[in-house]
Amino acid sequence: FVTTPDLLQYTRGEWLPLVIDVEYWNSIDARPNNAIPTVLHMPTNSKLKGSQQIDSELMKLETAGKIRYIRPEKKVAASLVPSLIEKSDIVIDGLVIGAYGVTSCQAMAARRIVIGNTNELGKIRPECPIFHSDPAIISSVIHDVIDNRDAWKSLGEAGYQFTKKYHDGSLTASKLSGFLDS
């Protein structure tokens, strides 16, 4: 088993989705209706997430008044993550590796717009509502997301439904049960 779809290119295996408490994250207050979109990036590993390029582009957009950028200076304690996601309209996860992780799942379950590198995921889960980006195109992707604000509600719902389908634990339990019973 592999926990992220990008690993399937390196080994024979089956995707075993990571598990979050989808209903807990869905209980976070509805996305704020900020006049200026609030964008959150809280990397666990800055190099693997492409944070240098993300910071550079998002600071330019913040200076231009297009967004408000939340960027914790250090790794965020798990207890603080819900309040940061609650304040955000858009969450940017990793842009370097073609996979998404816990932060993306939490943000999707909370009905936030998520941007990340989904290169490998598109091959096996094309319905994933994460906006694809890499460091080279993050500025244009952010502009596209901001310009399509009318779609945010339906995209937030799609994110919630995606996490409910793949990350609430039932699919993972079913796959593990089948494996353990064989």
Residues covered by each model-derived region:
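A short alpha->beta transition loop at the rim of the catalytic pocket in nucleotide-sugar-dependent
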Residues: 89, 109-111
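A charged, aromatic-enriched C-terminal amphipathic alpha-helix characteristic of glycosyltransferases
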Residues: 150-181
